[in-house]
Every structure is written in C-alpha cells, then in structure tokens.
Amino acid sequence: MANRAYKFRIYPNDEQKILFAKTFGCVRMVYNHWLDRKIRQYEENKTNVTYTICAKEMAAMKKTEEYRFLKEADSIALQQSLRHLDTAFQNFFKQPKTGFPRFKSKKRNKNSYSTVCINGNITLSNGYLKLPKIGQVRLKQHRIIPEEYSLRSVTVSQTPSGKYYASILFEYEDQVQEKELQKFLGLDFSMHELYRDSNGKEPAYPGFYRNAEKKLAREQRKLSKMQKGSNNCNKQRLKVAKLHEKVSNQRKDFLHKQSRQITNAYDCVCIEDLDMKAMLRSLNFGKTVSDNGWGMFTTFLKYKLEEQGKKLVKVGRFFASSQTCSVCGYKNAKTKDLALREWDCPQCGTHHDRDVNAAVNIRNEGMRLVNA
C-alpha cells in the first residue's frame, strides 16, 4: 500500500472558524502541557511518560471543571497531538540532531491540527469535507480523487494571511512497476540558478524572495512602527503575510513545474546529498539557499519519479564532484576555491565549466551506484 496527500483550500463559515480556533488552541495546549510533564518526569527520575499514560491522564483531565473546554475539540485531534509529541521525543533520543521538542507558541507556530478517519467520521463529497466537531466545510476540489483511494487522515491548517487548507491523506494499492533506467541526468546545486544539469542547462531561477526583498522590508518597517493590536497594525500584518505567501506560492509553482519536466524526460536523476541545514546557517549563503528551495525541489522530484517507477539517486556529500575531471578522472585541488568557475584539466587539457563538470560527475557516480 502507498500514501498520497492532496491539499485543498477550505472555506469555513464564521461559526466553523471559531471551532477551528478552539481546536488549534486545545491541540497546542495539550502538546505543551504534556511536554512540560515529560520534561519534569525525565529530570526527576530519567524515565519517560508514554503515550498511553498521557492519553489516560487527558481523559481524566477532561472531566475536571478547569479543563472541560477540551471536550469542545475533536478528541482524535487531541490524541494525535500526544502522538506527535511522543514521536518527537523518540526521534530526539534516536537522533539528537533532530533537536529537542519545543513548546508551541501561538505567535511563532502555525495553526494546524491532524485528525484520523475512523468509522466514516470524515468524508469528502460534492465539494464538501465533513470533519468531526466541525461538520460540513465547503472545499475547492481542484482534482478528482480516484475511487480506489481510501481516506485516512486530514490535517487542517491556517496560514498567517487567514486562509484555511485541508491536507487529505489517502491510501491506495501501489501498482507502479519499476522502469528500466536508461536516461540519466545529473544535477549540481547552484546558488543562483537552483541547479546546472549534466547537459549544461540551467532553469533560470527567478529568485522570488530576492526580487520581493525590498518591498517586504519596506512593509515590515511600516508594521514595526505601528501600535500593536490596533486595526491598522492588523491590516499591515495581514499585508506582510500575504506578500510572504505570494513568494512561497511562486516558488512552489516554479519548483513543481521544473520537477515535472525533469521527471517526464528522464528515468533516473542523480543529485548530491547536501547538508542543507549547514548551508542555511552560513552567513553568506543562508538567504539564497532558503530562496532556492533546493530541499523542497528534491522532495518534489523524489515523489514524482517514484510515481512513475523511476529513481532519485543521492551520491555522498563528500564525493569530489567539483574537483574531478569528468573526462580523465584527474583531481584538481585548486577547484576548492569557489571563485574558480572555469578550469583546464592539467592532465587531459579539457576545458571545464565548474558546475557542468560537477553535474556530469554526479550523473556518472549515480549510474555507478545504480549498476553496482
């Protein structure tokens, strides 16, 4: 079995908006309450409070006068919040680099909650999504869902600009057959053009955030000078949020189109396994890396390729793609200087464009890994 999610915009009425706000708040409160409980328990005797214990404590808490308001929220959404917390703790202890679970802030974190389909409590039909405690919510269904797809869960979210979305997860029987890999493409991450491929092509990435940076800074300055809580401040905050949302949507649209073009043309795409977090922390590269959305692009590539029985291959991040001559294999230590964009191989005399040569090496290494 395989999973696939579709994201649709939903249009709740005023009453449903209030119910969503209550659910967002309850889910956040449950997460923070038991995060604090887990921290104190661990500090006292180095033991963990399991999901089962947390769920029993929450059931008892709902019966008290102080926390009776939790009954107004979807009970499954509250349970899912506990599950997410439990998963976050397990991930931290398995791999500390993921970071310790943090308390959720009403201002810092986005409003969202997840609920699971049990006994038909969630349905999608005739342009409406039925949700527990919420009822029928109008939905803009821009694609047809195959009949064999089974609805498993829904994540409801609200953007800073006030729009509501439902990400619906479906389960279906995976019948994709792996294709014979004949056409290979290598991609080398490019700071300004997103990537250069092994054919020497680049996508001419527009740099949406960089283009909007001055306007964003101007509107952000206006917001910082306004009195917090005033009507004008709220209007300006919404304006800034919409600008950020526009940049995000432009980037996603571009990356979806680029990944689709590549997927349709090639059977196997080879990329470097880059440490994007380290690159984001770099003072010189942070904004550019974030604007490019390389991580998002590779995610799109991966699922699109897999849907067609194709492959995304990652070569090791320490593979010397830029230093190695793609013709004779000579390693040129001088290319460690990032300012060196073109070079001639001292051994075979081939003239190289740094990025294209790297992409060719990545493609060749990917082919070697596939055929090993």
Where are these regions (language model features)?
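Nucleic-acid substrate recognition interfaces
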Residues: 1-372
